[in-house]
Amino acid sequence: GHNPAILMKKDGSHELLETGGPVLGVFDSFEFEQGKFALGDSLLFCYTDGVVDATNNAEEPFEMERLVDFLKTQLDSAPSRICSGLRRELRNHIKDMPQLDDMTFLVLKK
């Protein structure tokens, strides 16, 4: 599953980009809603549900709030540093638990 992309603004606020449709490639034909936004000096974070669903041995998922809090600390970082930092945060969270779902994410910045 693909959760709504997160547009992280320079002031630390964020917006979920929910316009669209189902995951790409599942249906032969489907009309997607089209939306627009200006990236400006914001950060765009696209990800699969495996990121927020990553669970530790106490059965606590990583969750959206923890993801947004992490992204707030990375607003001035390069996309590659954000990705490596998030991989580290996820590993620290799940520790020795097996990865149960894919964790795919993409960071875009100007």
Give residue ranges: language-model regions.
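Conserved subregion of the PPM/PP2C metallophosphatase catalytic domain
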Residues: 1-110
